[in-house]
Amino acid sequence: MGAMAQNPPNLRPDLAPRLVIDSPRREGQPTIGMVSLGCPKALVDSERILTRLRAEGYAISPDYAGADAVIVNTCGFLDSAKAESLEAIGEALRENGRVIVTGCLGAEPDYVTGAHPKVLAVTGPHQYEQVLDAVHGAVPPAPDPFVDLLPATGVRLTPRHFSYLKISEGCNHTCRFCIIPDMRGRLASRPERAVLREAEKLVEAGVRELLVISQDTSAYGTDWKGPEKFPILPLARELGRLGAWVRLHYVYPYPHVRELIPLMAEGLVLPYLDIPFQHAHPEVLKRMARPAAAARTLDEIAAWRRDCPEITLRSTFIVGYPGETEAEFQTLLDWLDEAQLDRVGCFQYENVAGARSNALPDHVAPEVKQERWDRFMEKAQAISEAKLAAKVGRRIEVIVDEVDEDGATCRTKADAPEIDGNLFIDEGFKGLAPGDILTVEVEEAGEYDLWGRPV
């Protein structure tokens, strides 16, 4: 039997860090495996489930053979993601036979059991108690008088030097192509004190980079009734004082985002914004039920760069949205030329069960979507290549992710794990370790990656 499935990199249009877990097992100790699919928000859910189970005396298995049962935390955002989640469930059933399904696809239990009737239980997203109940029913915890005397150490599914920090759950937007509010509910922000306490513990444990995630990071705290109009601002400021790199993901383009830029210019928060613009033509954005002000967005981008010249802008876009004409797509290409975004992801539109966009007229043919995706990525690649070439000869700070006999794989402040590029050190890397932060001189640039040497 093999190791459990690694997260497919194409499962979701966002981060998909690889699952690596290992835990020593006592003789007779009940053991659970975990396959965690999809985005970092789901990964955090997996970490919480495993932390609770380990506190109850369960061991965590890195492979199917060593597990008494396997939890599959699924993704259900796109039809292609559902298909890959079903494939992962099928693999777990073949390799282990005792499978508990949770996560976004679990919100459709009939869909799951229709494909895999032998699963032990199906629970929805962030239903931690139901998952634990299902585990208890399948693999009862072994009596251990010492477990309750030991503090529960959090299980992390990322390398030790960076960690995802989920600050809220749910979303209040009604984008026609998205069903996240249906699956995960309306915005529910975690108390600032709880977020900061978790962040402090992570930094104390050696985390050098905090990746702030949610469905809508810039809306954090707007579900509260309090004197602070935009609570993400004081939260970001306090996180920045912990001494770790702080990277903001999934920032919806509200006007108050401009107030985060001074924190980046001061060095409290990394000069990096991950903002899903989705498109640039106003009519397409209206059909998406997104803000339709692409020209004003260009003005905002110019202001961000004026106030923080080192800022890196990442965004994602959808091509082939229902009704998208060639002229509307060309507007997107022209906008990309003007915006000169540093990091770009692009996805061909897919129908999602339950999404209102499915009912829109004039769906784009698959071959046209592919052709537009190719053209978009060709332009985005050229922009990336030119921007990276301009960094040759500069000295920049990097964090080390991996070191082997061939060299060190690092990231700059402009690069998030898994979705952005890397900086490679081929010489002078002896003595480096994951989590080290050092200065390098950039010697070579490619389309998405850099090469350099320590200085």
Curated annotation (Swiss-Prot):
Protein source organism: Cereibacter sphaeroides (strain ATCC 17029 / ATH 2.4.9)
UniProt remark on cofactor binding: Binds 2 [4Fe-4S] clusters. One cluster is coordinated with 3 cysteines and an exchangeable S-adenosyl-L-methionine.
Function of the protein: Catalyzes the methylthiolation of an aspartic acid residue of ribosomal protein uS12.
Enzyme class: transferase
PROSITE patterns linked: MTTASE_N, RADICAL_SAM, TRAM
Cofactors named for this entry: [4Fe-4S] cluster
Residue span(s) of domain MTTase N-terminal: 30-140
CDD domains: Radical_SAM (cd01335)
Highest taxon of source: Bacteria
HAMAP family: MTTase_RimO (MF_01865)
Family the UniProt entry places it in: Belongs to the methylthiotransferase family. RimO subfamily.
Gene Ontology biological process terms, A to Z: tRNA modification
TM region(s), chain numbering: none
Domain Radical SAM core: 157-386
Chain residues that bind [4Fe-4S] cluster 2: C171, C175, C178
EC number of this enzyme: 2.8.4.4
SMART domains: Elp3
A GO term, aspect molecular function: protein methylthiotransferase activity
Stored PANTHER family: RIBOSOMAL PROTEIN S12 METHYLTHIOTRANSFERASE RIMO, RIBOSOMAL PROTEIN US12 METHYLTHIOTRANSFERASE RIMO
Domain TRAM: 389-455
Catalytic activity: L-aspartate(89)-[ribosomal protein uS12]-hydrogen + (sulfur carrier)-SH + AH2 + 2 S-adenosyl-L-methionine = 3-methylsulfanyl-L-aspartate(89)-[ribosomal protein uS12]-hydrogen + (sulfur carrier)-H + 5'-deoxyadenosine + L-methionine + A + S-adenosyl-L-homocysteine + 2 H(+)
Matches recorded under NCBIfam families: 30S ribosomal protein S12 methylthiotransferase RimO, MiaB/RimO family radical SAM methylthiotransferase
Binding positions for [4Fe-4S] cluster 1 per the UniProt entry: C39, C75, C104
Name used for this protein in its record: Ribosomal protein uS12 methylthiotransferase RimO
